[in-house]
Amino acid sequence: MRVVRGCLLGLAVFQILSTLVGAVELLVAPQWFAPMLDHTAFAGQYLLAALLLGVVVGGFQWVAVLVHVRLRRWLPLGHALAGTVMVGWIAGECLVFDSFTWPHALWGGAGVLQLLLVLVLLGVLRALLGSTSFGSHPSPTPRDRWVMPSGPYGHGPA
């Protein structure tokens, strides 16, 4: 789980830097984004768009990092919220711009990856043990079969 936590932290830092760069670009060079934003509710509202991206979306990533470092008990919730906000922001951008481009795939994918890693951290998603394929024949040994989630919400042994 140490690797998963490290990936979550790295992903949150990547998202922080990305939202910071995006917000600064919106403020420093709004002409780059004018063609995209002119036909939306953000036409001429570059400061508002920068604040939403840098403070709100980036802020959730900052909180995820803070929780990750200081309040480990809340780590899954912090990253789940940050990933959800990122995916929501990207989905909103796609709807407002009526387009989907590679940056949407990159940062939306990073948000989805953040959510998937939280599921791995919580034990909801687990790897197949000792299996390298999804064959149709059952494995002769129990260790090669699917591992069901355990604990209060799983169906396997606690």
Which residues make up each language-model segment?
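Topology signature of small-to-medium multi-pass alpha-helical membrane proteins
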Residues: 1-158
